[in-house]
């Protein structure tokens, strides 16, 4: 059932242009607004026991991020049958996976790079909006392409590979929990909210295994001998951000040829295109592994 849902959703995601009603960001924003209106999540400021208040707020954040997934899992277990669960899981996965805005920014970046408009390339890189990893640029075509390619690799992981892995491991509740946590972390980071550090710690934990599985897929689909030492280096490190793990390994897994490096100096789109191809091959790798696990009976 999981494999069928993945194949169905990935096919539809490629064929259909999603409206906001079919993307997690809309519902995550509504959920956060509901919690805010009810006063269920807020940073409790005060001179007395400030650390205790912060801890309570962090615990509340984790609880309310997990709550919808628990409710969804209970509904699947006690209410829905096998067929309805398949329909429900496919719908939830379709809502959680992908990012129409990311795809639009990518196309705009390619057009700007083809025109040689580096200022527009820099603007589109900023529009990718990964709050926790802002990278400086010297304005050259090579640097703009590298910066955009790194952000694109990370966001592609967050919106595709990570969602797939959480879905494979825990079904629709897992995909929903990860997507809601990712969206909330970005919102708190953009707003410079006091809880952004707590949300960041949660995402570090949620990404720790999936990002290494994804990076392993990239080295399998790319230059294995070059990327393997880098993967081993980061495999058990607990102090390296997931963003750095993925971008460092992907840069080793897919190295530009001399001709591509020469073109990259003039056209910022070369490296992002190469990394997107690597990400697509990685998705296929994850599907193949899922198929194998399904055949041996490890997945339902």
What is each residue range found by the language model?
Residues 1-300:
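Hydrophobic N-terminal alpha-helices or hydrophobic patches in metabolic proteins across all domains
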